[in-house]
């Protein structure tokens, strides 16, 4: 942290390592240095984590991933803790013209209705997949936090990524 630092940007679950961190010490550090805390909550979603209630000032979501849920909308969501931030970001938002169409807004609203079901199912599937991959000779390491539907794999050097993907049955 330097005198020029204005904010801490935190991914509670890193990508692609899938390492989950305890964000509480960062909230304390931010308050101590009067910094904004910005959380990228894309992997956890509002269903699994509510950073504004935990101490964050700004929370970001890639709505394209879980919130939309059907790969038919490209969007992001920014939520803020207080009116001052909302007004500042709202002015910026208007200046750059970053608004969703009515259809994209509808698609995100539709996605929110089933978010809890999709998150629960993706967690179950990811846990089962992670367990199976841990026993595969072609995989050296499974990178999985245990809390989301996302995981990463490190293939054994003797195995080709292209061949692995070609033989993957979904």
Annotated model-derived regions:
Residues 1-138, 143:
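Conserved PLP-enzyme active-site core in the AAT-like
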Residues 147-170:
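Conserved C-terminal alpha-helix-loop-beta "cap" of PLP-dependent enzymes
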